Regions:
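A residue-level marker of the well-folded mature domains of exported/periplasmic proteins
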Residues: 1-148
């Protein structure tokens, strides 16, 4: 195993016991597992909830889907762990800036699944509906999705 990734602190225990890096999800565990911690995607729900609550109070709320991103502050990265090198930190910061600048572009082609089938042709951007209907593993990911 090269890296453990999951949203349970139990994964941190397993990563620590095995001495492998850990990338969490939805929770900052950087102080609990500093010797194996990489980072985690986290969510700041107030960026969504506060404007919606105000709209409800104002009588202007309209139902709809919300897909937050780094640009609106909804998606964040937890602190990078001490095992993350300076070179990697610089790459992460550059990629974060690129993601924010291209807010709304989550997947664009060319994109293939792990069987080599083209999912998105070069230059095409995935729609919200396509993202919500993802039922494949991308190129380079080993394994299969469960059937049924």
């Amino acid at each position: 195993i090269g890296v453990v990734a999951q949203d349970s602190p139990a994964s941190g225990d397993a990563a620590k016991a095995a001495g492998v890096p850990w990338s969490g999800y939805d929770s900052d565990q950087s102080t609990n597992y500093p010797e194996v911690w990489l980072t985690a995607a986290t969510y700041e729900w107030s960026t969504y909830e506060l404007p919606r609550i105000q709209a409800i109070l104002d009588g202007t709320w309209v139902a709809g889907n919300y897909y937050g991103d780094m640009a609106d502050g909804h998606i964040r990265l937890a602190p990078l762990g001490p095992i993350v090198t300076d070179e990697t930190r610089a790459l992460i910061e550059a990629k974060k800036a690129e993601i924010v600048a291209n807010s709304g572009v989550m997947f664009s082609g060319p994109l293939k699944d792990n069987t080599g089938k083209e999912i998105l042709p070069a230059g095409k951007q995935a729609t919200y509906e396509e993202l919500m209907g993802m039922n494949y593993l991308v190129e380079g990911v080993k394994g299969e999705l469960p059937k049924g």
